[in-house]
Amino acid sequence: MQNHKFSRHLLKSLYLSCCYEEIKVNKPGNVSVKSPKYGMNYRKFYRAAEISSKYIINKDYNVCESIYFACKNCLKELGSNYNLGIILMITPIIKTASEDFNSILDLRVKLKKKLNAINSQNTNLIKEAIKISNPGGIHNYSGTGNIMKSTENKLNFREMIKISSYWDRISKSYMNSYREIFECGLPFFFNSKKQFSRKFSIERLFIYYMSIGQDSHILRKYNKEKAISVSYKAKKILNHLKKENKYTEEKLINFDKYLKFKNLNPGTCADLTVTTLLIDKITDIVSISNLKKN
């Protein structure tokens, strides 16, 4: 079986291309080139990707260090949080893919080991990255495992994400080794690519993530009822996206206008979308490499 090990330069290129792709498509409620969100400049998302890439691919940093320095330097230049969720989701993948693996299944096994090892690393760096990034709605939570309270430092990172995984999809991804990506998003995107353009497939993927779970950002910022309502609306929209035409494009545009009017931003679904695009690109490269080898 062929071994794979992606260079840091290739991983940086793949990461940036995924961030750029995602910002160009219509993601209802979320920022895009053609539909900016009030107070958010899409060019800053480009810049956030460029800044964070330098620290994410740094071989001298472990997962915690890369996350912390990526967030810290993005905030230093941009002044606010533009990509905490993406950094949290992407960093373990890039660290794993930069080491030897022999298949996508093996990549997932080693990703699990990488995530489990975080507990023995300097997890306070990840906690600090989340604190300084101050993600939307995080101050609305006051229960056990509140990362914004210094009194919760007695909990290790694994214990904290176990608590938050009940409502936060990024924490859940850390707990179950990205099951939602590998077992839901990737197969859905793979099938979409067979039928539709890449642009429309990415838009469908974003709506799909909205439809299968409550968006963590909306849940934190508002409440469970609001998050469920948005997810229900996304399911109805997804049912209309079985063809790629002006009608479906109009459906997405109108849904985008509605969510932005209501100030409902499914930001976590955007993070899941970028992560899926990266793993999909890695999968494609591995598949092509195996074909050439055979």
Task: Please give the residue ranges for each predicted region.
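Long, hydrophobic/aromatic-enriched structural stretches that serve as scaffold segments
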Residues: S53-S103
